[in-house]
Amino acid sequence: MQWTLVVPVKALARAKSRLSDTADDGLRPGLALAFAQDTVAAALACPAVADVAVVTDDARAGRELAALGAGVVADEPGGGLNAALAHGAAVVRAARPESPVAALNADLPALRPAELARVLAAATQFPRAFLPDAAGIGTTLLTVAPGQELAPAFGADSRARHRASGAVELRLDAVDSVRQDVDTGGDLRSALALGVGPRTAAVAARLLIAGQ
């Protein structure tokens, strides 16, 4: 079974404001783009993934991610993250109604295709499932079987909200790269310790990060 992934990408100029203590205003847009590029490249390299649709209104992000092989869906609702994901899921469902769909965070720069494949294989057992983030508070992946509604509830406390909505929490070991999203300098250090993709590594080399 091959999946269609929906990856939301925020306008780069407004992305990753919580990394302000690690990357200045001039570097953060490039860092956010690098996260998305490494995430999408790893996802497309996963044998369980048929295609990736990026939902964004950022012209630069759309252009760079399309160059990697992703499809680009305009963020037409303009209603925030969950609206963008619901819209993206509807678009890909219209094109591939028989395909399972997963919403994947765009800030997983250490993502490993084999670990993503393990998570998606586990998710096939359930109509709707999710993977919590490394902090145990948020969500990095939400999956739905064909014919099921995505019903994303990303944002603050999304782990609890997805669980309350009936999605099954996936409890897997050795999938750290799929759980390690990056919102803070500490998150970035954790991702670097796992081993990030080449684009993130290149941008991160320009940052002064304690302990690196």
Swiss-Prot record:
| InterPro entries hit by this protein | CofC, Nucleotide-diphossugar_trans
Record carries keyword Nucleotide-binding: yes
Q: Does the keyword Nucleotidyltransferase apply?
A: yes
GO terms for biological process, alphabetical = F420-0 metabolic process
Q: What is its EC number?
A: 2.7.7.105
> Which keywords accompany this UniProt record?
GTP-binding, Nucleotide-binding, Nucleotidyltransferase, Transferase
Return the Pfam families for the record. Answer: CofC
Which top class of enzyme applies to this chain? transferase
User: Per UniProt, where does phosphoenolpyruvate bind?
Assistant: 139, 155, 158
Q: What Gene3D superfamilies is this protein classified in?
A: Spore Coat Polysaccharide Biosynthesis Protein SpsA, Chain A
UniProt pathway: Cofactor biosynthesis; coenzyme F420 biosynthesis
Q: Name one GO molecular function term.
A: phospholactate guanylyltransferase activity
Reactions catalysed, as given in the entry: phosphoenolpyruvate + GTP + H(+) = enolpyruvoyl-2-diphospho-5'-guanosine + diphosphate
Q: Which family does it belong to?
A: Belongs to the CofC family.
Q: Provide the function of this protein.
A: Guanylyltransferase that catalyzes the activation of phosphoenolpyruvate (PEP) as enolpyruvoyl-2-diphospho-5'-guanosine, via the condensation of PEP with GTP. It is involved in the biosynthesis of coenzyme F420, a hydride carrier cofactor.
HAMAP family assigned: CofC (MF_02114)
- What's this protein's name? Phosphoenolpyruvate guanylyltransferase
Q: Which organism is it from?
A: Streptomyces coelicolor (strain ATCC BAA-471 / A3(2) / M145)
Taxonomic classification, please? Bacteria, Bacillati, Actinomycetota, Actinomycetes, Kitasatosporales
Q: Which gene encodes it?
A: fbiD
